[in-house]
Regions:
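N-terminal Rossmann NAD(P)H-binding glycine-rich loop of SDR-like oxidoreductase domains
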Residues: 9-29
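SDR active-site strand-loop-helix element
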Residues: 12, 37, 80-84, 119-125, ...
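NAD(P)H-binding glycine-rich loop region in Rossmannoid oxidoreductase-like domains
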Residues: 51, 60-100, 129
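Glycine-rich phosphate-binding loop and adjoining beta1-alpha1-beta2 segment
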Residues: 35-63
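Catalytic Tyr-X3-Lys loop
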Residues: 81-84, 94-102, 106, 110, ...
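Glycine-rich "substrate-gating" loop/helix at the edge of Rossmann-like oxidoreductase active sites
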Residues: 147, 176-190, 197, 210-228
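C-terminal substrate-binding subdomain of Rossmann-fold SDR/epimerase-dehydratase oxidoreductases
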Residues: 200-338
């Protein structure tokens, strides 16, 4: 079993949603010997770092340069959580995505494996492309067809890791629909919970896409939602148990958009008002009506903790973070829903 308390921990993308939540969970465990790696641009994601405890910060490009030219300067690093990437599914600059999401990950993975460092990286559920329902992390990677350049950049590294003998020595995590505190900087890429909260506060209502398939009623399109607090507990489990290969990080259950938004109204103590609008014609042929992670491999790795019920997770997020405008703070709450 790998000890996260032994040696330094590196978290790339450490100011982002999942990265900052990983640091929070480590802090709750009493671990703060952490190097945060990120690109603090003009967004407000730096605010996610304010309550957290960590040893040092490095710009992502400087970190890459050092591991390529002065790897010896990083003595005693035992664990790397590589969670930094451009995660915009609408990013059109393919060269940027391949450089940032593919080449960068290759450099980090080889460096970590060569130096005996535990390496856990973020793949993505987007790599499954247009597949629906029971999405399996043991599927033949050659059969997957990503639908956007972001997903392809992630899938390309999964293929590289497999073909170069890395995937049996590292862990790739296919995060599904992660939501929770510390995501507001993501703008249009943030979860519907965050978007709906602000929409309800401003207008008293939330808009959802109508269904354009007869087997699904409006609002009953389904997704596998997972609370960020659960996602990071799974992430730490994978790192500690030396479980290698690809793992789906989801709840294993599909819920409807209505299941997601109704608890928001209750937590805000406002009447439920849901309006259904036409889906843009450009999305209709690409829209997935049901995604659900198979988590058999995760359970086989020994992770047996229950997933926070969706309504409880939404309630915790809205009441304890969105309404008071708080971020994850190890001084205020232990890991888990409180």
């Amino acid at each position: 079993m790998h000890s996260l308390a032994r040696g330094h921990v590196v978290v790339t993308g450490g100011a982002g949603l999942i990265g900052s939540a990983v640091i929070w969970a480590l802090n709750v465990r009493g671990i703060d010997d952490i190097l945060v790696v990120d690109r603090l641009d003009t967004s407000e994601k730096w605010k996610n770092l304010v309550p957290l405890r960590y040893r040092d910060y490095l710009d992502a490009d400087e970190f890459e340069n050092r591991i390529l030219t002065r790897a010896s300067s990083f003595a005693n690093i035992s664990t790397v959580f590589h969670l930094g990437a451009c995660s915009s599914t609408t990013e059109a600059d393919a060269a940027y995505l391949m450089r940032n999401n593919y080449e960068y990950t290759k450099h980090l993975a080889h460096w970590a494996v060569d130096h005996g460092i535990r390496f856990v990286y973020a793949s993505s559920a987007a790599t499954y492309g247009g597949l629906e329902r029971d999405l399996r992390d043991d599927a033949d990677l050659d059969t997957l067809r990503p639908l956007n350049m972001y997903a392809y950049s992630k899938h390309r590294f999964d293929l590289y890791a497999r073909d170069h003998g890395l995937l049996s020595r590292i862990a790739g995590l296919k995060y599904f629909n992660v939501f929770g505190p510390n995501e507001h900087h993501k703008a249009e890429m943030r979860s519907l919970v965050d978007k709906a909260f602000h929409q309800i506060r401003e207008t008293g209502a939330i808009q959802l896409f109508k269904s354009h398939r007869t087997e699904y009623k409006d609002g009953e399109q389904q997704r596998d939602f997972i609370y960020v607090k659960d996602a990071v507990e799974v992430t730490l489990h994978i790192a500690e148990h030396d479980a290698n290969g690809l793992f789906n990080i989801g709840s294993g259950t599909a819920h409807t958009w209505l299941d997601l938004v109704r608890p928001i109204f209750r937590a805000m103590n406002v009447p439920e008002r849901i309006e259904f609008i036409d889906m843009p014609a450009t999305l209709r042929d690409k829209y997935q009506y049901c995604t659900c992670a198979s988590i058999d491999r995760l359970r086989a790795s020994g992770y047996d903790a229950p997933v926070t019920p969706l309504a409880d997770a939404v309630d915790d997020y809205v009441r304890n973070y969105l309404i008071p405008d708080r971020r994850l703070d190890p001084a205020q709450a232990p890991a888990g829903v409180k």
